[in-house]
């Protein structure tokens, strides 16, 4: 049985709490436990890159991690992955800060990681690479003679040609991506955007619906929307409330709660969301004193100016809205710039009447799925969801909105707050059915199954050699 090798920018620690944060870690650990194998990635620490890999083995899984130098971390991670690729892939070219040394550092670190992984690989390993930090990784492995099956999963959106092709190094990135055997995307729109970018640059031959050749390299493209653990989330949400939360729930028994949580990021549409809530207060005054909107947005990348700017903007907007509409005994908007335990958030989801998830652009958005999974099926809340979140392709029974249209979002909030129990139950049941069928294990099993079906490049070349060899004529 082939071993699975997973490569990601960061690895979850090899302990019993590794998957407690949910998301990617749960899926990866599930795949590794099924096949046995290796999880390879950055340790999260800076230091001497020449030090031996730190290896930990538990059961049939080995964790191998490495340090990065301060310069490599800054150029590869901060300056290129997060200051070029992240804003560009989220359609924010105005925030891209391209610097040639950062591009060189990005390529250098991908080459370094390939050098470190190479001695650990076995001939029949199946290799699964994750996310935008490692776009050139298969190319570096191929340069080193690796013919194993290599798959790639992009967790963020893939932009259309007019966005992607504005990157100074777009052509190199596209050609290097074709060194993967299988390219996975969150949505069909992302998959088609990649193929459009490729077709604008070179001739792409499509052998079947999702099998292609470019620059003489054969690869497949497919859609793999990442899922969650709905049963585990429901279990966490239904457990007893901590004393403080129980007291708050009692105090707010006559107040309808609108709730949002995500890390502080310009892609999440938080300023637009605040303005939409203000439009709700302005156009639907019957809700005054009867609703409360709580926004949790812990700081991420706090040293980056764009993130500092949005934090200050939100603080100012929250103060302005509360000053304009607040009353004695009623604060309409609570903005909390701090981290909360994930299990506690699931309980808060369960007692929120509306889940408000309106990113301007998002690969999937697992918060939307978690909100649905956390609800009481007999008395569920309503999900208001951006059309630009990947989850909108699956959760079609949510109230789908354009986050740039504050009046539309306000109208959806009013509808959610006044929706009948029967309609809430019906919409929730339809979404929960999708989430249960397409859970995190289904996601990883589909990807691994498709990757296993691909013929390794070494076998492909042998087949071509046989076809091209003719007996010598007498």
Curated annotation (Swiss-Prot):
- Report the protein name in the record: Trehalose-6-phosphate synthase
**Pfam families, sorted:** Glyco_transf_20 (PF00982)
One GO biological process term is: trehalose biosynthetic process
* Recorded superkingdom: Bacteria
- Enzyme category, top tier: transferase
Assembly and partners are described as: Homotetramer.
Is Cell inner membrane tagged as a keyword? no
Instruction: Indicate which residues the UniProt annotation says bind UDP-alpha-D-glucose.
Output: 22-23, 263, 268, 340, 366-370
EC no. given is 2.4.1.15
Keywords from UniProt, A to Z, are: Glycosyltransferase, Transferase
Reactions this protein catalyses: D-glucose 6-phosphate + UDP-alpha-D-glucose = alpha,alpha-trehalose 6-phosphate + UDP + H(+)
* Classification lineage: Bacteria, Pseudomonadati, Pseudomonadota, Gammaproteobacteria, Pseudomonadales
Its pathway, per UniProt, is: Glycan biosynthesis; trehalose biosynthesis
Residues bound to D-glucose 6-phosphate? 10, 77, 131, 301
Q: Which gene holds the coding sequence for this protein?
A: otsA
Q: Which family does it belong to?
A: Belongs to the glycosyltransferase 20 family.
> Could you tell me what this protein does?
Probably involved in the osmoprotection via the biosynthesis of trehalose. Catalyzes the transfer of glucose from UDP-alpha-D-glucose (UDP-Glc) to D-glucose 6-phosphate (Glc-6-P) to form trehalose-6-phosphate. Acts with retention of the anomeric configuration of the UDP-sugar donor.
Q: Which organism is it from?
A: Pseudomonas savastanoi
| Record-annotated site: Involved in alpha anomer selectivity | 86, 156
One GO molecular function term of this record is: alpha,alpha-trehalose-phosphate synthase (UDP-forming) activity
């Amino acid at each position: 049985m082939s071993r699975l090798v997973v490569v990601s920018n960061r690895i979850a620690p090899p302990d019993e709490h590794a998957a407690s944060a949910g998301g990617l870690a749960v899926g990866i650990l599930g795949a590794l436990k099924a096949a046995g194998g290796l999880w390879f990635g950055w340790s999260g620490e800076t230091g001497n890159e020449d030090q031996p890999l730190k290896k930990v083995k538990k059961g049939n899984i080995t964790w191998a991690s490495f340090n990065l130098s301060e310069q490599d971390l800054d150029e590869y991670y901060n300056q290129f992955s997060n200051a070029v690729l992240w804003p560009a892939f989220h359609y924010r070219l105005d925030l891209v800060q391209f610097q040639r040394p950062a591009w060189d550092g990005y390529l250098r670190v991908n080459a370094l990681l390939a050098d470190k992984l190479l001695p650990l690989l076995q001939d029949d390993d199946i290799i699964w690479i994750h996310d935008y930090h490692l776009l050139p990784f298969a190319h570096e492995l191929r340069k080193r003679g690796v013919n194993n099956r290599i798959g790639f999963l992009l967790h963020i959106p893939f932009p259309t040609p007019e966005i992607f092709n504005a990157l100074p190094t777009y052509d190199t990135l596209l050609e290097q991506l074709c060194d993967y055997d299988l390219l996975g995307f969150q949505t069909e729109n992302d998959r088609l955007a990649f193929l459009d970018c490729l077709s604008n640059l070179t001739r792409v031959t499509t052998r079947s619906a999702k099998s292609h050749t470019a620059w003489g390299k054969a690869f497949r493209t497919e859609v793999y929307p990442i899922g969650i653990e709905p049963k585990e989330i429901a279990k966490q949400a239904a457990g007893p409330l901590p004393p403080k939360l129980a007291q708050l729930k009692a105090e707010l028994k006559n107040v309808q709660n609108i709730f949002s949580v995500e890390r502080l990021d310009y892609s999440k549409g938080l300023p637009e969301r605040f303005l939409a809530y203000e439009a709700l207060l302005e156009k639907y005054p019957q809700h005054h004193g009867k609703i409360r909107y709580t926004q949790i947005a812990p700081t991420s990348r706090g040293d980056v100016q764009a993130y500092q700017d949005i934090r200050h903007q939100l603080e100012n907007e929250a103060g302005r809205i509360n000053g304009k509409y607040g009353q004695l005994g009623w604060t309409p908007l609570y903005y909390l710039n701090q981290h909360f335990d994930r299990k506690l958030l699931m309980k808060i989801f369960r007692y929120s009447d509306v889940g408000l998830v309106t990113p301007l652009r998002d690969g999937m958005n697992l918060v939307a799925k978690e909100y649905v999974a956390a609800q009481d099926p007999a008395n569920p809340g309503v999900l208001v969801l951006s059309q630009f979140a990947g989850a909108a392709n699956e959760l079609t029974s949510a109230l789908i909105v354009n986050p740039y249209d504050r009046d539309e979002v306000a109208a959806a909030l009013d509808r959610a707050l006044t929706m009948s129990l029967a309609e809430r139950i019906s919409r929730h049941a339809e979404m929960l059915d999708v989430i249960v069928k397409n859970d995190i294990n289904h996601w990883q099993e589909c990807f691994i199954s498709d990757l296993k079906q691909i013929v390794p490049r070494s076998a492909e070349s042998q087949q071509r050699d046989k076809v091209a060899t003719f007996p010598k004529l007498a």
